[in-house]
Amino acid sequence: MSKVYDTLGNLKVGSFIVIDGEPCRIVEMSRAKTGKHGSAKANVVAIGLFSKAKKTLVAPVDTQVEVPVIEKHVGQIIADMGTMYQVMDMETYETFEVEKDSIEEDIRNKLGVGSEVEYWVVMGKRLIIRPR
């Protein structure tokens, strides 16, 4: 299971949400009551984990939204293959590839062959978060 459901009103800045099929981190959130008989609305601004694109969502606070399940693991970079890193999981010894473009610039500068990294598995995709 890579997603669960939660009420939009329960989420806070720093939480994760799925908008347009992409997992995102909430960077700004505001709530407003629309009038005497209207329900409160939430305005969510989020940044995509993989595309780094800004996404917005305006919906009632009692709306059920998808929240991605994030699995955190430790791995080691075993090869630099130009546009990708080959990473080995430190628990299962499984190897996989991660695109360098999905890693932030300042983190990418600290990485090299033999570096231990923390990576997340989000909705079936892997993302290197930080060196250990």
Curated annotation (Swiss-Prot):
Which cellular component terms (GO) are annotated to the entry? cytoplasm
**Where found in the cell?**
Cytoplasm
Q: Which GO terms describe its molecular function?
A: ribosome binding; RNA binding; translation elongation factor activity; translation initiation factor activity
Residues annotated as carrying Hypusine in the record are 36
Q: Name the domain of life this protein comes from.
A: Archaea
Q: Which UniProt keywords apply?
A: Cytoplasm, Hypusine, Initiation factor, Protein biosynthesis
Which processes are annotated in GO (biological process)? positive regulation of translational elongation; positive regulation of translational termination
Coiled-coil intervals: none
A Pfam match is IF5A-like_N
Concerning CDD domains, the annotation shows: S1_aIF5A (cd04467)
- Biological role stated in the UniProt entry: Functions by promoting the formation of the first peptide bond.
Task: Please give the NCBIfam families that the UniProt record associates with this protein.
Answer: eIF_5A, PRK03999.1
Its family remark reads: Belongs to the eIF-5A family.
Protein's name according to its UniProt entry? Translation initiation factor 5A
Q: Recite the lineage of the species.
A: Archaea, Thermoproteota, Thermoprotei, Desulfurococcales, Desulfurococcaceae
